[in-house]
Amino acid sequence: MAGPKLDGAGNAKLATLESALTQLQRVHGVVEQCAVAVKGQQPASTFVPQIRRATQPMVGLLKGQFGMISDQVASFLLAATRGGGNDHTRVRILREGVVQLRVQLELAVAKTHELHTIDDAHEGPAARGTSS
């Protein structure tokens, strides 16, 4: 059974959110690789450029339709690229940032479904197959 029908704006927003979730999975993978390296006493700084490259496109992708989430991604990027401090603390901050972004994106998907679902009652008699 197919999911609920969405209007055009809802489909566009969902496509944007799905793309952002896919990119976030890539960021999460890099963060977890960083965590494994830090656990093995290797520096986390070698993973910062990878995180930056994986995160920067998300800012532009989300800016048009989801500005507040885009600002959160930019904040995550700032926290990821900030120098100094303990590598274990950096990994913790990166993991928390990934979780926050995932929650916001999933909430945006749910809200998009809620706001852009097309009801059969609003489609008119021709769409339902009845005639007046």
Where are these regions (language model features)?
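Amphipathic, coiled-coil-like alpha-helical segments
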Residues: 1-34, 85-132
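Alpha-helical segments in soluble extracytoplasmic regions
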Residues: 34-54
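Alpha-helical repeat scaffolds in large eukaryotic proteins
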Residues: 32, 39, 56-59, 63, ...
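Short, well-ordered alpha-helical segments
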Residues: 47-50, 61-79, 93
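Hydrophobic alpha-helical segments of small multi-pass membrane proteins
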Residues: 56-57, 74-82, 96-100
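A ubiquitous short alpha-helical element
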Residues: 12-19, 39-43, 59-64
